[in-house]
Amino acid sequence: MMPKHCLLGLLIILLSSATEIQPARVSLTPQKVRFQSRNFHNILHWQAGSSLPSNNSIYFVQYKMYGQSQWEDKVDCWGTTALFCDLTNETLDPYELYYGRVMTACAGRHSAWTRTPRFTPWWETKLDPPVVTITRVNASLRVLLRPPELPNRNQSGKNASMETYYGLVYRVFTINNSLEKEQKAYEGTQRAVEIEGLIPHSSYCVVAEMYQPMFDRRSPRSKERCVHIP
C-alpha cells in the first residue's frame, strides 16, 4: 500500500511538467541499483537514499534493452514502496544486454534516475545446485541429477534447461559417515550416475554441484541425500 503522505508526490510527478518540480537533493537518489540474477530470475534491487527512510519513499522503475532509445515503465513497480522489482519477464533473452533504472519521489520532490550497469543474464546469473535423487540398488547407488528450472520457455512451451545455455559438468561426491571420508565419485556431463564399490554396513551421503568450465565457476553444493548400505 502506498503511504498516503506520498500520494501527492506521485500525482505531481504524473501531472506536472518537469519545470514545475524541483529535483530533490542527491541524498534522495536510490543507491546501489543492481540486478541480482539466479537461474535467470532477474530481480532489480536498490537501497533508499540517505535522507529518507525507505518506508517514506515511493519508487518508479523503468527498463530497456541496450540500443533502444525509449525507456519502458514497469507497471507493477510504478509507485512501489518495495526496494526490489522483478524484471524477469522483461529480460528473458539471456544473451541480450539490458538496463534498469529507479527514481524516488515523495511529497512533491523527486530524485534523479539511477541506472544499473549493463546487465547480461547469460554472463551474470548464478546457478543453484542440481536436484539430486538417489536410489540404492543392492550395494550400489543410482544418482539422478537435474539442473534448476528456468523461467525461459522452449518451443514446446516447457521450461528450458540450463544445459541449453551452458556446457555443464556435474560433480558427485560420496561421504562415508563411518569413516568421515569424502571422495569424488563422478565428474562428467551425464545426469544418471552409478556409484559402485561401496562398503557394506555403512552409511553414505551424496552431494553434487555443477561446474561451468567457460567461466571457471561452480554452483553451491546440493543438500545431502543419505542411505544405508546393508
Curated annotation (Swiss-Prot):
Major localisation: secreted
Extent of the signal sequence: 1-20
Every Fibronectin type-III domain range: 29-128, 129-230
Taxonomic path: Eukaryota, Metazoa, Chordata, Craniata, Vertebrata
PANTHER family given in the database record: INTERFERON/INTERLEUKIN RECEPTOR (PTHR20859), INTERLEUKIN-22 RECEPTOR SUBUNIT ALPHA-2 (PTHR20859:SF51)
GO cellular component: cytosol; extracellular region
Family of the protein in this entry: Belongs to the type II cytokine receptor family.
GO biological process terms, semicolon-separated: negative regulation of inflammatory response
Secreted in keyword set: yes
A Pfam match: Tissue_fac
UniProt GO MF annotations: interleukin-22 binding; interleukin-22 receptor activity
Origin superkingdom: Eukaryota
Originating gene: Il22ra2
Keyword vocabulary terms for this entry: Disulfide bond, Receptor, Repeat, Secreted, Signal
Function (record text): Receptor for IL22. Binds to IL22, prevents interaction with the functional IL-22R complex and blocks the activity of IL22 (in vitro). May play an important role as an IL22 antagonist in the regulation of inflammatory responses.
Disulfide partners: 77-85, 205-226
Name of the protein in its database record: Interleukin-22 receptor subunit alpha-2
Subcellular location(s) per record: Secreted
Tissue: Highly expressed in lymph nodes and at lower levels in lung, spleen, and thymus. Not expressed in kidney, liver and heart.
Site positions (Critical for IL22-binding): 66, 118
